[in-house]
């Protein structure tokens, strides 16, 4: 039974792409294959999009809008189901990497008994495939009761954060206060979605955005990477301040 103290109830919610792993374009290639198969020539509808921080459902909507194709949920569901199958092939390609400091950090958090989850724009199986490629999927729980938010929870990233908080509350048996969650991400969209719910954000400059850009976006704390971040995150779990906050 979880302790009722705030510190023991704290939860760290990780983004996936650009935060934990770099998938070397596997997701973009997989979705491109599916869109071509379903819709024919898509020209530059996908290549012209900045996907950082977008949910998979929003990416599909944006591509369909660019092509002048009507959006409907059934089509989106079908495209994303096919995308997962294509991703199984693409994720094994070259260039994939687990970002520096991630595996030892997750190992330290697991050994400490920390509660961690995912807050990602990926569909759940897409996230699992990416983390499994890097051998780090076992650090997270999967299934309907896992503390997580995924693309199936909504197009808007704010809804994904809300879903993760709600599942955290269900798991803990009482409401998870936003200040007792910490989103770790690498894009301004991660920041704005979390802040919309009052959740503090640790941003890491391991994706496309610099430390300055992430700080300007409103991140509570910013680090160059997750390398060496374990002590600061353990301190936050024990009731301390958000890692990466300027002294």
Descriptions of predicted regions:
Residues 2-48, 52, 58-66:
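Active-site neighborhood of HAD-like aspartate-dependent phosphohydrolases
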Residues 183-221:
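Acidic, Mg2+-coordinating phosphoryl-transfer loop and its flanking beta/alpha structural elements
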Residues 35, 83-84:
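Membrane-embedded alpha-helical bundles of multi-pass transporters/translocases
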Residues 123-182, 188-197:
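Substrate-recognition "cap/lid" segment bordering the active-site pocket of phosphatases
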Residues 149, 221-226:
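Short acidic-hydrophobic, aromatic-tinged amphipathic segments that line or gate anion-handling sites
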Residues 57-71, 164-167:
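Helix-loop "lid/cap" segments that line or gate small-molecule binding pockets
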Residues 1-14, 62, 71, 180, ...:
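Non-catalytic pre-domain segments flanking phosphatase-related domains
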Residues 13, 88-118:
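Short, acidic loop-to-helix structural element flanking the phosphoryl-transfer center
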């Amino acid at each position: 039974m979880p302790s009722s103290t705030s510190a023991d109830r704290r939860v760290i919610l990780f983004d996936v792409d650009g935060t934990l792993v770099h998938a070397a374009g596997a997701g973009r290639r997989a979705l491109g294959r599916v869109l071509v198969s379903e819709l024919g020539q898509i020209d530059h509808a996908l290549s012209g999009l900045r996907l950082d921080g977008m949910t998979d459902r929003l990416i599909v909507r944006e591509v369909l809008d660019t092509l002048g194709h009507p959006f409907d949920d059934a089509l989106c569901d079908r495209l994303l189901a096919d995308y997962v199958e294509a991703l199984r092939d693409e994720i094994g390609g070259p260039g994939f990497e687990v970002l520096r400091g991630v595996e030892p950090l997750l190992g330290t958090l697991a050994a400490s008994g920390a509660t961690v989850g995912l807050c990602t724009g990926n569909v759940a199986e897409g996230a699992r495939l990416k983390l499994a490629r890097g051998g780090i999927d076992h650090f997270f729980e999967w299934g309907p009761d896992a503390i997580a938010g995924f693309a199936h929870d909504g197009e808007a990233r704010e809804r994904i954060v809300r879903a993760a908080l709600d599942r955290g509350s269900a798991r803990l048996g009482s409401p998870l206060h936003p200040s007792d969650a910490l989103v770790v991400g690498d894009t301004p969209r991660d920041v704005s979605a979390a802040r919309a719910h009052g959740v503090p954000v640790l941003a890491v400059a391991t994706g496309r955005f610099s430390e300055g850009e992430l700080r300007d976006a409103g991140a509570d704390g910013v680090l160059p990477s997750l390398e060496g971040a374990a002590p600061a995150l353990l301190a936050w779990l024990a009731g301390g301040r958000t890692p990466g906050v300027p002294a």
